[in-house]
């Protein structure tokens, strides 16, 4: 869930994400954590692929392809990712498609890694969460779809919140879909937001979604202008503006 979405207590939702000491969210993105993050990633990959200690390279990692839509910034990100992976022996090719073709390819799940982006048109974290239910037209990761339908790798325990829900090694439909449905019917604000944090925890535990950056909306506004409003989609509203002299 991106910056700007508020939590039940009025704080930012992302500030309360994850369950880590010393940093916000699911990854420590500080400069001081770079080396330890790198080492953790290498050690994780060593469990599954052959690593040559003398060269610092993986020798049998499958070739990846990064799919992105036309745009210089998207291309630059892909080039950086490809370069960073090449440094440890992982080949990631780049594939550029125009927008409509890109959307269809991604929706069909015909990719190994693909760029994605999302904007919320209202201030509620559910806008970033319900898109990943099995039946969602935006579920391009293919959670619970096709060959992933019967993957039983997810766990969910909501008994501490008063729900008779405890699933071990369940499918996406038995876990994530369930918690999103509960969010949509919950009338208690504190419980509803806690359910959304649990949903995000489950989503991020899959490792299928890797946030790179948040969009920003830069503009200049003179101190004399009052009543200006900019919504989450970047639209600017001046109809209630006044200028103090």
Give the residues covered by each predicted segment:
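Bilobed periplasmic-binding protein-like "clamshell/Venus-flytrap" ligand-binding domains
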Residues: 1, 47-70, 114-117, 169-221
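Periplasmic-binding protein-like
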Residues: 1-21, 77, 200-211
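Short, solvent-exposed loop/turn and secondary-structure capping segments
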Residues: 1-4, 77-79, 125-128, 214, ...
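Solvent-exposed loop/turn segments at secondary-structure junctions
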Residues: 5-8, 70-74, 99-101, 119-123, ...
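Short, solvent-exposed loop/beta-turn-alpha elements that line the ligand-binding surface or hinge
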Residues: 11-39, 51-61, 105-109, 130-181, ...
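Bilobed "Venus flytrap"/periplasmic-binding protein-like clamshell domains
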Residues: 38, 68-81
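Hydrophobic alpha-helical packing residues
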Residues: 45, 81-86
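Periplasmic binding protein-like
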Residues: 86-145
């Amino acid at each position: 869930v991106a910056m700007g979405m508020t939590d039940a207590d009025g704080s930012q939702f992302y500030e309360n994400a994850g369950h880590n000491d010393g940093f916000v969210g699911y990854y420590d993105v500080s400069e001081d954590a770079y080396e330890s993050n790198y080492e953790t990633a290498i050690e994780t990959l060593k469990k599954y692929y052959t690593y040559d200690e003398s060269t610092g390279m993986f020798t049998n990692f499958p070739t990846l392809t990064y799919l992105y839509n036309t745009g210089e910034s998207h291309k630059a990100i892909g080039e950086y990712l490809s370069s960073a992976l090449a440094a440890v022996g992982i080949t990631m090719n780049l594939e550029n498609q125009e927008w409509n073709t890109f959307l269809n390819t991604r929706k069909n799940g015909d990719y190994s890694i693909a760029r994605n982006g999302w904007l919320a048109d209202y201030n509620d974290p559910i806008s970033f969460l319900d898109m990943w239910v099995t039946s969602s037209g935006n579920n391009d990761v293919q959670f619970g779809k096709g060959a992933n339908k019967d993957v039983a790798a997810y766990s969910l325990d909501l008994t501490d919140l008063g729900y008779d829900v405890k699933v071990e090694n369940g499918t996406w439909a038995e876990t994530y879909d369930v918690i999103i449905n509960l969010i949509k019917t919950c009338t208690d604000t504190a419980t509803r937001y806690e359910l959304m944090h649990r949903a995000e925890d489950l989503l991020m535990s899959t490792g299928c979604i890797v946030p790179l950056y948040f969009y920003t909306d830069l503009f200049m506004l003179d101190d004399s202008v009052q009543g200006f409003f900019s919504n989450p989609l970047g639209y600017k509203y001046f109809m209630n503006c006044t200028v103090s002299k």
